[in-house]
Amino acid sequence: MASLKIENVSKRFGSVGILSDVNLSIDDGDFLVLVGPSGCGKSTLLNIVAGLEPLSSGSISIDGRSVQNLEPKERDIAMVFQSYALYPSMSVAKNIAFPLRMRRQSAQEQAQKVRQVSELLQIGHLLERKPQQLSGGQRQRVAMGRALVRDPKIFLFDEPLSNLDAKLRVDMRTEIKRLHQRVRKTTIYVTHDQIEAMTMASHIAVMKDGVVQQFGTPSDIYDRPENTFVATFMGSPSMNLLPATVQPAGGKLNLRIDGTDALIRMPAHLARGAAALKAGQPVLFGLRPEWFLCGAALPDTHVGLRAAVDVLEPTGPDLYAALRLGPHEVMVRLPADARVCVGSDVDFGVDLSKALVFDRATGVSVQ
């Protein structure tokens, strides 16, 4: 296992900036997920760590040792790609053993390590097959086996599940997490899928336009996003952001939801950051769909509002309702058996103990 430090890493292709002053510190045995939309620079950063792409400035160190001038083979890193990258003419066993052959290990050592890895990944019965005889999930397991057999310091995964169907993605997601729990190797995993990021990571780095927007645990990222990009990118459905205006009353700050009569007291947990807000300042009131309760009887942590039901979306375990609050649409998650119907007005409560406020001009969270 190994720790990894990325300091002030930037990457340019000519006049085009791809990465800008990226700083990340990954502890020994950590599972870091780099997540963001296409073109945000996450795969470029992974390739720089692997040594496949030179950096323009900054430094990469593994266990305190600078590696940016080392060849990929000298960094003791194994990488799993989206496209599997298996040799079609070789059997599964030979594909897995290939890195060991390159290290000139004995046939006995190769056979022993291939057997151990195949048992770990539950592909022992596939060792004599060729890649074209395997399913997508089986091919991905073979690709992981080839990385595992090297026993590297760090594992890199570049969108390994993108080619799989939805059910297989869920299955493989669980397998990769289980594998990490067993081997406890430092891992960096790239994906554009925020569900993969939330379910697999011990830490997440959310990226946009080559800049790390936020680094933290999944709960930090989800419950305390530092800006509106993170708030809306992480979570499905995404966070509701209601335009509002700061309005003092009785020595306290309140939020007036624009275009409505709704007046909401400033959440108490935001008091320190809200002290810098000015009367009349435009903000965004952030609410996740599950931070609502339907009904008139509400706990003290909630404030009541009334809205019209516009659309209902049953998903089985949950019922998502698109509510119309003045000119704004609010997506709310309700129990599957909630008694609401399209066109009706409903009373619902907002959990102020979790609600967030963002500066509308900068998108930065008020905390």
PLM regions: where:
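Helix-to-loop junction immediately C-terminal to a conserved catalytic motif
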Residues: 50
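ABC ATPase nucleotide-binding domain
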Residues: 5, 25, 61, 347-349
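The feature captures the beta-strand-to-loop junction immediately N-terminal to the Walker
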Residues: 35-37
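Conserved ABC transporter NBD signature motif
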Residues: 58-66
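Conserved coupling/switch loops of ABC nucleotide-binding domains, chiefly the family-specific signature
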Residues: 56-59, 109, 209, 355
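Glycine/charge-rich catalytic "coupling/switch" loops of P-loop NTPases
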Residues: 223, 252-310, 329, 338-367
